[in-house]
UniProtKB/Swiss-Prot annotation:
Part of a complex composed of FtsB, FtsL and FtsQ. The keyword Glycosyltransferase does not apply. The chain crosses the membrane at residues 4-21. It comes from Shewanella oneidensis (strain ATCC 700550 / JCM 31522 / CIP 106686 / LMG 19005 / NCIMB 14063 / MR-1). Belongs to the FtsB family. Keywords: Cell cycle, Cell division, Cell inner membrane, Cell membrane, Coiled coil, Membrane, Transmembrane, Transmembrane helix. This is Cell division protein FtsB.
Length: 99
């Protein structure tokens, strides 16, 4: 009976060692849980970005307003009959009086 109890205690010690410091231990489990959470956050952000891009693609395929807006902003195109004005030096630094 004594041998049986000693064997159980040794097995319990080995299992505890494996649980706390072996492969697939609890500390490793918690690190992996943090990595999974970070990856899921990144995936959620990328899914939102993909949804915005899908909506933009649908908008570009279906209507001319989005194409016209992009042409105006990115290519500087102007409608017939409009006058184009360019403001030069619009970003002036405001200087405060020195003391």
């Amino acid at each position: 009976m004594k041998f049986f109890v000693i064997t159980l205690i040794v097995l319990l010690g080995l299992l505890q060692y494996r649980l706390w410091s072996g492969d697939n231990s609890l500390p490793e489990y918690f690190v992996l849980q943090k990595q999974i959470a970070a990856q899921q956050d990144g995936n959620a952000k990328l899914n939102e970005r993909n949804q915005v891009l899908k909506e933009e693609i649908i908008d570009l395929k279906s209507g001319t307003e989005a194409i016209e807006e992009r042409a105006r902003n990115e290519l500087g195109m102007v409608k017939e009959g409009e006058t184009f004005y360019r403001v030069v030096g619009g970003d002036r630094a405001v200087s405060s009086p020195s003391q």
